[in-house]
Amino acid sequence: SLYAPSAVVISKTQGASADAPAQRAVTLRCLPVGGDHPAPEKACAALREAGGDPAALPRYVEDTGRVCTREYRPVTVSVQGVWDGRRIDHAQTFSNSCELEKQTASVYAF
């Protein structure tokens, strides 16, 4: 292939620790698009737009005007694998699942 591989495992955990057992995890492959992520095309496009940096996703997500409550029910997500030939090991905690979806769009929507 002419392109460097991009394949990651994305997981979601209730709570503020990435060390807790994942409640759900999916695989995502880009070029060719696949894995068991429910919307791989959208997730690959979002990561591509963010330069493969999951921490940068909020800067690229379209503001839908969605309003979230201030409820604190932390959700921690992680992305591990290879993006465009570079190793990724990212974890981030959001104050609740609404904030997670609002700030990251389709990548963690599973």
UniProtKB/Swiss-Prot annotation:
SUPFAM superfamilies: Subtilisin inhibitor. The keyword Transmembrane does not apply. InterPro entries: Prot_inh_I16_SSI, Prot_inh_SSI_I16_CS, Subtilisin_inhibitor, Subtilisin_inhibitor-like_sf. Its main location: secreted. The record marks 70-71 as: Reactive bond. One of its GO terms (molecular function) is serine-type endopeptidase inhibitor activity. Disulfide bonds join 30-44, 68-98. It holds the Pfam family SSI. Keywords: Disulfide bond, Protease inhibitor, Secreted, Serine protease inhibitor. It is found in: Secreted. GO terms for cellular component: extracellular region. It comes from the Bacteria. Transmembrane segments: none annotated. Belongs to the protease inhibitor I16 (SSI) family. Homodimer. Strong inhibitor of subtilisin BPN'. This is Subtilisin inhibitor-like protein 1. It comes from Streptomyces cacaoi.
